[in-house]
A protein has these predicted regions:
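Substrate-binding pocket helix/loop in short-chain dehydrogenase/reductase
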Residues: 97-99, 106-108
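Alpha-helical segment proximal to the catalytic Tyr-Lys
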Residues: 127, 171-175
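Residue(s) in the substrate-gating loop at a strand-loop-helix junction
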Residues: 142
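Active-site helix of classical SDR
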Residues: 122, 158, 166
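Active-site loop-to-helix junction immediately N-terminal to the catalytic Tyr of the SDR YXXXK motif
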Residues: 102, 148-156, 168
């Protein structure tokens, strides 16, 4: 029996990288998954999980869209009866464009996915978890949110925002049985 046996978990950004690896690992530990990505690649991740005997539902959705986030969280609750954990992992790098050449639209897109996305995941998962008096919320951050480097301006700013969002949310969740980390 795995450490996540029977737990209902949502993972965004599950089409590749950390999200794909987490989906496979969580499934091996017994989690029942709803995995989300904006691309068809999420179906490949679902096949890896399913072929290994895991329980999984793949959803193609935009982790920065409030309607999509609410829908995939509600889908997990409807399918599995509860939501034990969510990992807001979807993100975009934004590239290494000189600041003077960046556009407001470029910044808005990076912030929409990397910061608004985790905010929406928190906003729509918290009520379910508070009602259960348990749950775990994880948001992918980065050292780029703590220290300047070559990661790009909007990326670093978005990850600094995620760190602050998680810290302030942890304070507000005190005593609810729900924990949050980045």
């Amino acid at each position: 029996m795995g450490r996540l046996e029977g737990k209902s978990v949502v993972i965004t950004g599950a089409g590749s990288g950390i999200g794909r690896a987490a989906s496979v690992l969580f499934s091996r530990e017994g989690a029942k998954l709803v995995i989300v990505d904006k691309t068809e690649a999420v179906k490949e991740t679902a096949k890896l999980v399913s072929d290994a005997g895991g329980t999984v539902e793949a959803v193609i959705a935009d982790a920065g869209s409030e309607n999509d986030v609410k829908a995939f969280i509600d889908k997990a609750v409807a399918k599995y009866g509860r939501l034990d954990a969510i990992w807001a992992n979807a993100g975009v790098s934004g590239g290494l464009v000189p600041l003077a050449e960046q556009t407001v639209e470029h910044w808005q897109e990076v912030l929409r996915v990397n910061l608004i996305g985790p905010f929406l995941a928190i906003k729509h998962s918290m009520p379910h978890m508070i009602k259960q008096k348990s749950g775990s919320i994880v948001c992918t951050a980065s050292v780029a949110g703590l220290k300047a480097g070559a990661s790009g301006h909007p990326y670093g700013a978005s990850k600094a925002g995620v760190i602050s969002l998680v810290q302030t949310t942890a304070y507000s969740l005190s005593g609810t049985g729900v924990r949050i980390n980045a």
